[in-house]
Amino acid sequence: MSASPNSLIRIGRGEHTFEWLENWAVIPDTPEGRADGRTHGVVVTDDGRVIVFHLANPAILVFDAQGALTDAWGDRFPGAHGLTLVKEGSTEYLWLTDYKTGEVVKTTLQGETALSLPFPDLKGYDDPKYAPTWVTVFEERFGGNGDIWVADGYGAGYVHRYDKAGKYLSSMDGTAGAGRFRHPHGVYVDSRKTDPELYIADRMNRRIQVYDLDGKFKRLVSDAVDTSACAFIPHGDFTLIPEAPYRARLTILDPDDRVVATLGENDQVCTRAGFPNDRALVEPGRFVTPHSVATDEAGNIYIVEWITGGRITKLVPVK
């Protein structure tokens, strides 16, 4: 990490060098936002708007390309968590998960409900309760059939599958793979491959499990040992993985799942007093609890963290 001549902070190296823009955008200064306000999800729309899902009302915040708040909605998400952007034809939609209410809903960018997923048709779901954390879709624009996977990361530790109409199909728990999931926090269908694969952030087991789309185990991501993966997104040929709470960094994988860079690494913060929510731990150029990530057409990266009061950072590639 180094300071550039104009006092901006630079992180990374080689082709993965970025300028760090601290507080590129901020959540509204409200009592609820100051008391909690943890920023859990982020996506970027085709027209460059940055949408953030956070733990305060309204839960959805919409920022323009300069980081100014332009819209906000959503007063029914007390457990605002995973946020996924999908596209059907020319229309963009959001998938949102709420780990407190168990709601998994697809909405328009304006917040109108397009589809709600039913409770998983699985016995023994009273204790623990259903607490979904993330959604991924095998999108038709990438040659998929529209099937939906939901990670129950804070509940019973399953990954559930639905068809594109929202009909429950099946569940998996990891026992057919590397072992029972513990907090399967994030899920991601990698459609870039000839044979698409399902990546699962098996977070408390500190590993990433990879399956084919029929649920057959393929491998562990061996180069991401002792990981703390929260989520996944594609970035050109690379995959970006925010890691917390056992690590604090943004990891970049190449197409062969090899770690080629880590950004904002700050693993020592994970054992400091006040972790993970004390804002005194925040230091420009280093992450505390990176939870979700998104990119835009220019290659900029946006990272949100679950720290109290929220944190929205923009990384600008250095050409």
Q: Which residues make up each language-model segment?
A:
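Eukaryotic scaffold repeat domains enriched in small/polar residues
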Residues: 1-319
